[in-house]
Design a protein with these regions (language model features):
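Bacterial N-terminal signal peptides that target proteins for export
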Residues: 2-13
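C-terminal segment of classical bacterial N-terminal signal peptides
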Residues: 17-27
Length: 238
């Protein structure tokens, strides 16, 4: 009888572990199976706990990770150039110094992600969620951020040369010392507040500001589209 109870306890424990794993395993419905296998190969990951997923410097160039859940994963220094990350969940992930050049990041959740010094050159970030993301010193040259959400994001010293920010929401964002030379800022939106958007010392030379609302933005020392240096707090371009 005692042995029977021990076996029952053992099988109950195994069943509990299986159910726990199934419950917490992240959805990867549209992600390519081979690419996901490559993602896990030779890397230590706990499939149901992505925050323990160590994918530092992994090579996923051109991988199909559409709708994959990599929330909280460590992808610092990873090569994701040309990868399909449409509608993927990368919230809270570490992508510092990662290469995402020419990647498809349409509708992707990158909220609160660490994107310090990441390379987004010529990347499509349409409707991406970059709320509270850290993009300091990131390369966004020629990137398309159409209708992206950058609420409260840190873009200090980022390179946004020739980038498209048409309709982007940068309320409360930090763009101090950011290079916005020749960027498209049509319908760029800020909201006057005690927590103003910081564009101090940013370079806006040659930028398109048609319809941009910069009222309340901090523009002290910013180089304006005509090359002049602004000394006012903010203004509205209609």
């Amino acid at each position: 009888m005692k042995r029977l109870l021990t076996l029952k306890t053992f099988f109950a424990a195994v069943l509990a572990i299986v159910l726990f794993t199934l419950y917490f395993t992240p959805p990867v419905m549209a992600a390519n199976t081979e690419d996901l296998s490559q993602l896990l190969k030779d890397n230590w990951c706990v499939s149901f706990l992505w925050k323990q997923c160590d994918l530092i410097a992994v090579d996923l160039q051109g991988a199909n990770l559409q709708e994959a859940n990599l929330s909280g994963a460590n992808l610092s220094g990873a090569n994701l150039s040309g990868a399909n990350l449409k509608n993927a969940d990368l919230s809270d992930a570490d992508l510092s110094r990662a290469n995402l050049a020419n990647a498809d990041i349409l509708g992707t959740d990158l909220s609160r992600a660490n994107l310090t010094e990441a390379n987004f050159k010529s990347t499509r970030l349409w409707d991406a969620n970059l709320t509270l993301a850290n993009l300091s010193r990131a390369n966004l040259q020629n990137a398309n951020l159409l209708d992206s959400r950058l609420w409260g994001s840190n873009l200090a010293q980022a390179n946004l040369t020739d980038a498209t920010l048409h309709g982007a929401d940068l309320q409360y964002a930090n763009l101090a010392y950011t290079n916005l030379t020749n960027a498209d800022l049509q319908s760029f939106f800020f909201r006057g507040s005690k927590q103003v958007t910081n564009l101090s010392n940013a370079n806006l030379e040659g930028a398109t500001l048609t319809g941009a609302n910069l009222r309340g933005a901090l523009l002290t020392g910013a180089i304006m589209p005509d090359g002049s240096i602004n000394e006012e707090i903010g203004f509205n371009l209609n």
